[in-house]
Amino acid sequence: FALAKSGATREEMSSFKNDHIEEYVTDMSLERVEEIIDHFVQAAKAAKDVGFDMVQVLGGHVISSFSSGYINHRKDAFGGSTEKRAALACEIVKAIRKEVGEDYPIEYKIPIHDDAVPCGQGGPELKELSVFVKQLEFAGVNAFQAAMGNRLNINDTVPPKSHADFKGEGCFLYISDVIKKYTNLPVSCAGKFSDPKKNQECIESGRLDYIGMSRQLVADPEWVNKVADGKEDDITRCIFCNRGCLGSLLSREKFHCVLWK
């Protein structure tokens, strides 16, 4: 679960457009940085207190902005080198670990920026994953999930079926392949996983240790039970249109899937 509060208040977010995020991140006070870290800690604590078995730290939004060399131009401990741009993510993980204890699992979802595809600028680059993965593991992460990061268009991080660069299931597997080079921790991946056979192949081949699904579970919350019962033909397969699930969130309408009957 991505249980994190936005780094900016609603009033702050309304005061600038995406074009101003570089200035916002670069000029953010250290006091504000500490507040953001505490937001993540309190969210993780709340998740544990109500009984969740683990938490996922979503390294997007304000974290991916700090992680990005395109966006983050700070001159202090939270900006500059790759190591320093990883500092906010690591401090968040360390603080959560201190709060929840050593035995509580923390997964880190690490969205990246890839120059090879026309997506936004959030997150570290593929070549920087060696630094980010190792530092996050040292900070206390138990597992990683691969994803795409951006700050401009939600279709780049949650790719619709029509996206020119992300056709087919498991479209971010090439990112998890890179992460696996730098860690022995469990690695999963998000991005168009609906086919049980494809999922099983990814696990049996060692490309993934487990599968990350979101939209498919919205389309059919019984996906896991149907697979376990051998009723794969009864699965309502996500069509990755983003119209119902994400569309309803962005338009502040009642959350739904266009496939729901």
Where are these regions (language model features)?
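Flavin-dependent oxidoreductase catalytic cores
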Residues: 1-261
